[in-house]
């Protein structure tokens, strides 16, 4: 009998074990789409980004005009740019939903997978930040100035570190050049880390909505979930193309249509929408170092989540108190996102401070208390 190439060829065997014959729980819901979506987003971003890099000039004198030239004179350059810019937003929508899913269903108990995932999120945030600087519009320039300046809050080495990062005494040509280099490199780092993420995931297998072991009832990934994923893929594609074709500038900042000018500060400096929650936490502390620490903690707190799990159940499916807290946390993040987009004045300052306090309180204090209470109520 001839050998089955798919199962025996060294390379195809890896693909087969990851995408075709992968044993998958039979009851995973649409919330498990998002890992696949993120992979699609990453591939799309790398392809569109590569096409953009072919026409982009990483120089302060030409960056803005090279982007304009791309949109006007390159075949479908406008479409490639719109897909790349809005693809980034979609990427963050997917990763936030993916993290939310992991939080709700207790997927974070696969500690290695979760920790690599948090590092992936940090790398993605760094990639998006340096990418936002490249068009060299007003918000690009001032966003870069404000965010890189935060490193100066580090005691003793801060100022030296910032000047080293800038390559001079302000954000200028060397900064733009190195940011382009980082923006080109980091997606490939993300690809490598994604493979590590998947390797750890396939060690334990996927979690499921009930949070119980599913070894006794698994089905092959293909054809069941490969077909199911196509529906999600179609919906995601419709969303991205609709956004890119009908309202490509909806999520951008109008200030970025003005070339960078170090002598004119925009009235309200703010990052892209997907960083606003962290930006609101940063602004809610009236001390520079304190704000920077809170900003870092807002994402790094995810590393603590597996350590704070005290419930005897893995998933929140049958834990009403934790569910209430979870959806309160979601609402709190939406409030933080909204506050981050508003000017620094009353009442937004106090709302931001209360929402920031609530964010850390829910994660670090209320979740463990609710879990312990549920254990007690259920006599577990």
From Swiss-Prot:
Coiled coil start-end: none
GO MF entries: metal ion binding; ubiquinol-cytochrome-c reductase activity
Cellular localization per UniProt: Mitochondrion inner membrane
Listed cofactors: heme b
Principal subcellular localization: mitochondrion
GO cellular component, one term: respiratory chain complex III
Residues that bind heme b b566: 98, 197
BP term (GO), one: mitochondrial electron transport, ubiquinol to cytochrome c
Key word Chaperone present: no
Pfam (any one): Cytochrome_B
Keyword Iron included in the entry's annotation: yes
Chain positions recorded as heme b b562 binding sites: 84, 183
Record key words, sorted: Electron transport, Heme, Iron, Membrane, Metal-binding, Mitochondrion, Mitochondrion inner membrane, Respiratory chain, Transmembrane, Transmembrane helix, Transport, Ubiquinone
Bilayer topology annotation: Multi-pass membrane protein
Transmembrane segments: 34-54, 78-99, 114-134, 179-199, 227-247, 289-309, 321-341, 348-368
Residues the record lists as binding a ubiquinone: 202
Record note on cofactor: Binds 2 heme b groups non-covalently.
Stated family: Belongs to the cytochrome b family.
Miscellaneous remark of the record: Heme 1 (or BL or b562) is low-potential and absorbs at about 562 nm, and heme 2 (or BH or b566) is high-potential and absorbs at about 566 nm.
Assembly and interaction partners: The cytochrome bc1 complex contains 11 subunits: 3 respiratory subunits (MT-CYB, CYC1 and UQCRFS1), 2 core proteins (UQCRC1 and UQCRC2) and 6 low-molecular weight proteins (UQCRH/QCR6, UQCRB/QCR7, UQCRQ/QCR8, UQCR10/QCR9, UQCR11/QCR10 and a cleavage product of UQCRFS1). This cytochrome bc1 complex then forms a dimer.
Function, as annotated: Component of the ubiquinol-cytochrome c reductase complex (complex III or cytochrome b-c1 complex) that is part of the mitochondrial respiratory chain. The b-c1 complex mediates electron transfer from ubiquinol to cytochrome c. Contributes to the generation of a proton gradient across the mitochondrial membrane that is then used for ATP synthesis.
PANTHER family (alphabetical): CYTOCHROME B
Protein name (Swiss-Prot/TrEMBL): Cytochrome b
